[in-house]
């Protein structure tokens, strides 16, 4: 049961990061503020989940 809860929490966290980056067009500093986490924490979580800020930047 704990494993299921951990997976659900990780997926929710990953989705929140993606939504924040989408809302800020890939600006990590703004996304960190939006999520109320330290910039370094966001950077480490992005690396953990394989999320690149460039995916969310407008060309």
Identify the role of each PLM range:
Residues 1-59:
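Bacterial C-terminal helix-turn-helix
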């Amino acid at each position: 049961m704990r494993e299921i809860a951990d997976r659900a929490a990780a997926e929710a966290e990953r989705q929140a990061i993606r939504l924040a980056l989408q809302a800020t067009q890939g600006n990590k500093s703004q996304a960190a503020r939006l999520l109320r986490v330290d910039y370094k924490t966001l950077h480490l979580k992005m690396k953990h989940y394989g999320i690149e800020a460039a995916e969310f930047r407008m060309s």
